[in-house]
Amino acid sequence: MAQKQTPSGPTQRQQRVAELIRHALAEVLQRGDIQDPVLGSHVVTVPEVRMSPDLKLATAYVMPLGGQDEAPVIAALERHKKILRQEVARRVNLKFAPDLRFRRDETFDEAARIDQLLRSEKVQRDLESAPREDDEGEPDSSSRD
């Protein structure tokens, strides 16, 4: 039975499988099951995994703690992709173990950019000049009889 891919995003099954794989990857990386000097010297977080509609490809978004040495960490994960796939397959009960892809997680950068925009002088000026909800002439609920 084919799963429907909705234009609004991934299916519930894709999300559930992605979360299982995220937990499995995080556990493998936390325990240090992969013997690699780069991975051994960094704490790697896995904030998100996205699954393809057929559940055969998992894209893991990773970030070393502190955000430094991203390229070597991703290269090390790519080198050990086969072992990581085997470990994920051992921990997650699926018909097929998905191929793994590793990408840099950019959500922290995006959050910092949005925070910087919100703190900008222009936005602060707009917020100060905007009318407040309680100033719009609506009666206060405490003054009702």
Curated annotation (Swiss-Prot):
The keyword Cytoplasm applies. PROSITE patterns: RBFA. Residues 122-145 are annotated as: Disordered. Monomer. Binds 30S ribosomal subunits, but not 50S ribosomal subunits or 70S ribosomes. Keywords: Cytoplasm, Ribosome biogenesis. One of several proteins that assist in the late maturation steps of the functional core of the 30S ribosomal subunit. Associates with free 30S ribosomal subunits (but not with 30S subunits that are part of 70S ribosomes or polysomes). Required for efficient processing of 16S rRNA. May interact with the 5'-terminal helix region of 16S rRNA. Belongs to the RbfA family. It is found in: Cytoplasm. This is Ribosome-binding factor A. One of its GO terms (molecular function) is ribosomal small subunit binding. One of its GO terms (biological process) is maturation of SSU-rRNA. Its main location: cytoplasm. The gene is rbfA. InterPro entries: KH_dom-like_a/b (IPR015946), RbfA (IPR000238), RbfA_dom_sf (IPR023799), Ribosome-bd_factorA_CS (IPR020053). GO terms for cellular component: cytosol. Residues 122-132 have a biased composition (Basic and acidic residues). It comes from the Bacteria. It comes from Methylorubrum extorquens (strain PA1).
